[in-house]
A protein has these predicted regions:
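Positively charged, low-complexity/disordered segments
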Residues: 289-295
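Extended catalytic cores of very large enzyme megasubunits
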Residues: 1-284, 288
Length: 295
């Protein structure tokens, strides 16, 4: 029996060539406003599939278009340069750019790690994904939209952010060299917390970890039941200020961060067990928060 040497991809929606050839594109504007009419975000002349709703357009453009560091091109795809001969950088202006950086990066890593049986299968994988993304048959999570392909397609790097990855060539856990060559593409995290103020795994350390995840578009949740309740004794002789005081710090920090650097606020989940001494305070606070939200 022949040994399986990789994935074989059968085309269902595309044929060799341009995967977008049957898709109609149009230029649109995207504008996000507050209830009082003030403008949160606005971008004009963006290229979107004609079948997309305005809501889908606004989500794509305001949240998932990269807003800086992207080489600008003319209508023929040639890079634009300034008077010094440097490539002009700016935002993504077409959803094709987003679909391309996602599908081409996934194909690249698949080929790097030997996933495909042949180059033709890798190309079919890429083309099928581009078509399915453009026709809304498929969509990845937000961190993929935000981060995937920024290094592979545009050469973006940035300082290391404390992320680690398993090097496929060695099997070793390795610190990331920069922000985007091996980005953080996972959506949701559950993190633990120790009843400790400043040491690793403690309260303040959690806020740093949460900020790192929020910055790249992820959400996080934690059960805070390990923390002592208000008035419980501390080893230094004082008493704890309680869970609620620390939750307010975390809530303010999360509210100040734009998830993925866009208009989307960070997603955060707080859990407190029913038998925790501060559960009634937490319940009352949560009820008050809900009642203060607009209808």
């Amino acid at each position: 029996m022949a040994k399986n040497t990789g994935l074989k991809i059968n085309r269902k929606y595309t044929s060799p060539g341009d995967p977008y050839k049957d898709i109609v594109w149009e230029k649109r504007s995207s504008k996000i406003t507050n209830p009082d009419g003030s403008v949160v975000f606005e971008m004009n002349d963006v290229e979107i599939p004609s079948t997309w709703s305005q809501v889908a357009t606004d989500i794509m453009v305001s949240k998932y278009f990269r807003k800086a560091g992207v080489p600008q091109t003319d209508e023929n795809g040639n890079e634009l340069k300034d008077d010094n001969g440097d490539v002009i950088l700016g935002p993504e202006t077409s959803s094709k750019q987003v679909f391309n950086r996602l599908a081409e990066t996934w194909r690249h890593w698949g080929e790097e790690t030997g996933y495909f049986a042949s180059t033709e299968d890798a190309q079919a994988f890429e083309d099928e994904l581009k078509y399915m993304l453009a026709t809304q048959m498929a969509a990845p999570n937000s961190p993929q939209w935000f981060n995937t392909g920024l290094n592979y397609k545009y050469g973006l790097t940035g300082k290391p952010q404390g992320f680690w990855y398993v090097d496929p060539s060695t099997g070793e856990l390795t610190p990331g060299e920069d922000s985007y060559s091996r980005p953080q593409p996972h959506a949701c995290f559950i993190q633990s917390i120790d009843d400790d103020l400043v040491n690793e795994g403690g309260i303040m350390d959690l806020w740093v970890k949460e900020a790192r995840l929020f910055k790249f578009g992820s959400g996080t949740g934690t059960n805070f039941s390990n923390l002592r309740g208000e008035g419980e004794k501390l080893s230094g002789g004082g008493v704890s200020s309680g869970v609620m005081s620390f939750l307010k710090i975390g809530d303010r920090a999360a509210g100040a961060i734009k998830s993925g650097g866009t208009t989307r606020r960070a997603a955060k989940m707080v859990i407190l067990d029913l038998d925790h001494p501060d559960i009634e305070d937490r319940s009352e606070e949560h009820t008050s928060e809900l009642q203060s939200q607009p209808d």
